[in-house]
Regions:
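Short, surface-exposed amphipathic charged segments that create phosphate/polyanion-binding patches used
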Residues: 30, 153-165, 286, 305-315
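ATP-dependent carboxylate-amine ligase
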Residues: 1, 176-179, 186-193, 197, ...
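Short, conserved loop/helix-junction motifs that constitute active-site signature segments
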Residues: 77-83, 112-117, 234-237, 261-268
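Short, structured coil segments at secondary-structure junctions
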Residues: 8, 82, 116, 138, ...
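Short, polar loop motifs at secondary-structure junctions
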Residues: 17-20, 125-128, 147, 275-279, ...
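Short internal beta-strands
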Residues: 14-16, 87-88, 119-125, 242-245, ...
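ATP-dependent carboxylate-amine ligase catalytic core
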Residues: 2-107
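Adenine nucleotide phosphate-binding catalytic loops in nucleotide-utilizing enzymes
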Residues: 96, 100-107, 111, 118-222
Length: 338
């Protein structure tokens, strides 16, 4: 969305969240890291962001809601940002310990970010009618986008994986702002890839050519499965499928989601598990004796490297779960192999 507004000559500032949070300014290609205090990410940092927007005399801000807790989402929207265009990308099973326990609860929590007397962009899905009612209560115009109208030929123009959902949402934002579709489509093509963008890389091991996909940024099973399905549709040459699942001790709910909604639903030959609090994965894999399961919790990283190289033979290596901990090092290691 930032690149679309920039393409249309807006003085736009963008701010991303997550591990590699950045500031983007319309007048430079350089991206500036968000310097955080010792306590880490905090919605209070939004005050500094707004000050920078004002100082630069920008006329647009594209900003992710960094709050997960519903109460913090209310504060983020009503007190810190006051966005006049809200965007709800999807309702998925992530952070269920805070937003759940059901998807209906997640949808309800997201209503905190719907503006009053503004515009709301949502996807055409099972929650469209629910958000429509909430938008009407707040006198906000609803813009519903449909991923099925995005042509595959456009998606193939990017040098990284792009999903029709994302393109549809950005076109909805363009409509809300008043940017024509042609400008919006070109703006997306001109956009620098997000740090979490899914790229496909070849690497050699055991005298064979292997395919590597870093899907750590997806964070939850539904998006991860969508990425895997997309990769499989491209018919890359491989005879073996290796899943690397990296777990976090402070995200055991996320690990459980992958156990419940991913490991038993997708096809693979080998599961390599790294990180911490992997017990539930081990318990599940005891019910899958036909698959090779290797657990590296508590082991030296050099053992993980050797294990990956040993298994990579005409293989697709697909990384999922969390980038924190060994995840980032695993991605760097494989990306460094010719």
């Amino acid at each position: 969305a930032y690149s679309v507004l920039r393409e249309d000559q807006y003085r736009v500032v963008g701010k991303t969240t997550g591990t590699d949070a950045r500031m983007l300014y319309w007048f430079t290609e350089k991206e500036y890291p968000v310097i955080r205090k010792p306590q880490g990410a905090n919605i209070g940092e939004q005050r500094d962001i707004i000050r920078k927007v004002v100082k630069q005399k920008a006329n647009a801000l594209v900003n992710e809601c960094m709050a997960v807790n519903p109460d913090y989402q209310i504060t983020f929207q009503n007190d810190l940002v006051k966005a006049n265009i809200g965007v709800i990308v999807n309702v998925m099973e992530d952070h269920m310990d805070v937003l759940g326990p059901t998807l209906k609860d997640v949808a309800q929590a997201f209503t905190a970010t719907i503006p009053y007397n503004g515009k709301l962009v949502v996807m055409k899905d099972n929650y469209t009618s629910f958000f429509a009612k909430e938008a009407k209560k707040r006198n906000s115009e609803l813009i519903v986008v449909d991923k099925d109208v995005i042509p595959e030929s456009y998606l193939r123009k990017f040098d990284y994986l792009v999903f029709p959902d994302n393109v549809a949402i950005v076109l909805g934002i363009a409509q809300a702002v008043g940017v024509d579709e042609e400008t919006a489509l070109q703006g997306m093509l001109n956009a620098p890839a997000d740090p979490g963008a899914v790229r496909i890389k070849y690497f050699h091991a055991n005298r064979t050519k292997n395919v590597f996909v870093n899907a750590f940024a997806a964070n939850e099973p539904q998006s991860t499965k969508a990425i895997l399905n997309k990769v499989e549709s491209y018919n890359y040459p491989y005879d073996k499928k290796i899943i690397i699942l990296n777990c976090r001790s402070d995200r055991v709910d996320r690990t459980q989601l992958f156990v419940d909604n991913f490991l038993g639903e997708v096809d693979y030959d080998v599961l390599i598990c790294t990180g911490k609090s992997t017990q539930m994965v081990t318990q599940f894999m005891e019910t899958m004796p036909e698959k090779t399961y290797i657990n590296y919790e508590g082991r030296d990283f050099v053992e993980i490297e050797k294990g990956i190289l040993h298994e990579a033979e005409n293989a697709l290596v697909f990384c999922v779960g969390n980038i924190h901990g060994p995840g980032g090092r695993i991605a760097e290691f494989i990306e460094g192999i010719e």
